[in-house]
């Protein structure tokens, strides 16, 4: 099985709360374009794959300023890795969005420490929210096993 960690940035030019079935439209970054190219190559050339789209952050938040206008489903790397491991152990396939409820980067950073707020630079996507319905339904079932 081919397992690929992609990014929520592939949805940055899409509608908010993009689902796995939506056509991803990356925003302004080469990072997003390169991840989407990898995703599409895997989908076209592999039958047994798991593509996980998410955005993890290190904990504690390492900066003194956080962006109040960048929103997404990002969270601590250990939380998202737990979701990823459950998908792998249960031999899931296809494309999966992983993350936690929508929040701003400022809200995320403020959970751990006092930070200043500022707008995100123009070259960063502002909205990378994803539909997590598929993941949440899976996690309910997985946790019952």
Language-model region placement:
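Active-site Tyr-X1-5-Lys
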Residues: 26-55
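Substrate-positioning beta->alpha
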Residues: 51-54, 62-89, 94
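Hydrophobic anchor at the start of a short beta-strand
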Residues: 2, 48-50, 95, 115
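Short glycine-/acidic-enriched loop or helix-start segments at secondary-structure transitions
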Residues: 12-15, 61-62, 107-108
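Amphipathic terminal alpha-helices
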Residues: 132-145
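Conserved sequence/active-site signature of Rossmann-fold short-chain dehydrogenase/reductase
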Residues: 10, 55-59, 103
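Conserved Rossmann-fold NAD(P)-dependent oxidoreductase catalytic core, especially the SDR/UDP-sugar
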Residues: 1-28
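Mid/C-terminal beta-alpha module of Rossmann-like enzyme folds, strongest
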Residues: 80-131
């Amino acid at each position: 099985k081919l397992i690929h960690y992609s990014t929520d940035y592939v949805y940055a030019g899409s509608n908010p709360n993009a689902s796995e079935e939506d056509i991803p439209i990356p925003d302004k970054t080469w990072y997003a374009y390169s991840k989407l190219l990898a995703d599409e190559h895997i989908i076209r050339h592999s039958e047994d794959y798991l593509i996980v789209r998410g955005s993890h952050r290190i904990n504690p938040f390492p900066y003194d300023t956080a962006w109040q206008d960048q929103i997404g489903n990002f969270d601590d790397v250990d939380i998202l890795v737990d979701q990823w491991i459950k998908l792998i152990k249960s031999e899931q396939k296809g494309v999966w969005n992983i993350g936690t409820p929508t929040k701003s980067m400022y809200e995320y950073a403020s959970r751990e420490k006092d930070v200043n707020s500022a707008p995100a630079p123009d070259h960063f996507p502002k909205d990378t929210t994803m539909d997590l319905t598929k993941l949440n339904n899976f996690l309910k079932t997985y946790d019952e096993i």
